[in-house]
């Protein structure tokens, strides 16, 4: 046997020392990438770059990007996802170029799922390139205002069930609004996306709610897995990372096809998302009945081979709707109720607006009524500023790109991020940013605000396709809750809130118990 020193132990020590030196030199060179480009960056750590706090689950990925945002007064900041260089864009003018003006250079997202995750990898959130574009165009008629108006009765029915739930429980105990709003959001998504009445508010063991919990149950491993899905495609492949577990996939698949088969056998139509998916399955397109301008479909059918509306490709669409919809709607609702409980003057002003609409509509507000309340929109907008459900936007640079007004060239394949917590809580754009103030979104203040500093739904061709639905679900619930109840903090309400260091979406470490009292100013 050939040895280096004639001593096995000494050989092992030499090899170990060589590996340590090689690793040190690799990281020493690798971690000078941004310095060599003249880009400011927080000091990275060997192996982990700037993501050790996320690996240790002391800071969520969104909070890490917030920390990086605050690390330097610069239009952009370099950082390292383990050993991979990435860049955080801070300047609103550059953000505009990334999201809109130069979209073709940044049209792909960085988030990814393993190919074996047949539901998680075949939707608008994770698809890139021509398949994403084709799917986006085909789905765009789903979320027009006309379609939302047709789905409104389904959402309103869930809001009335939420109102009934509060009536039954308001006088006995404080209500945990995180769980209550999650049940409401689950009922809304299950009825609109899957055509199933899950009855989560009535049944504590409802299947849809149980699977929703599992998706967002952030164990130590799940936290690391989701972090990889957003930030490290290499780790996703190594871990075989999934948005949906095998159990969840089988559940959603069964619900979907059972519903499809029942409707087609019995010729049932319900004006929901499932009806539109049946159109896609049978015709390859969705009728744009209300005539609203959507993504252009001309010349897109030549790419139909890139994405077929069959099998799990179909199931993945309501699966994403379920995942992206229920948690974001629930957190927006719970944060809004929390802030209104702490500021009764804001709550009373909103209740007064709701009471006026209830009076003119004889207690039956329409879709137009809900979307026609200016102060309600200001309140929800301020919640989305302070608590953006997904606290980051992610892109990948698809070609060497010279940043306008600078000498920096972002190299191809570089991950590009926008920190919404940083942007939305930057005192330069929002004075006293920790203060919850809906007046920031008055028409006058909106006109004065710098563009591209408010991005809860993203912007440009990659913006959230379901934003109208999200607004409808949240606003309808608030109208029916505050029409009859005052919401107040109780002795167990956490003040201030502590944000979770594990969750990929913005969430609190604990529950949010609040007290609901029948309003003396109710109008029905």
UniProtKB/Swiss-Prot annotation:
One of its GO terms (cellular component) is endoplasmic reticulum membrane. It is found in: Endoplasmic reticulum membrane; Microsome membrane. Keywords: Endoplasmic reticulum, Heme, Iron, Membrane, Metal-binding, Microsome, Monooxygenase, Oxidoreductase. One of its GO terms (molecular function) is oxidoreductase activity, acting on paired donors, with incorporation or reduction of molecular oxygen. It comes from the Eukaryota. Heme binds at residue 464. PROSITE patterns: CYTOCHROME_P450. It is a peripheral membrane protein. InterPro entries: Cyt_P450, Cyt_P450_CS, Cyt_P450_E_grp-I, Cyt_P450_sf, Insect_CytP450_Detox. Its cofactor is heme. Disulfide bonds: none annotated. Its EC number is 1.14.-.-. Belongs to the cytochrome P450 family. This is Cytochrome P450 6k1. It comes from Blattella germanica (German cockroach).
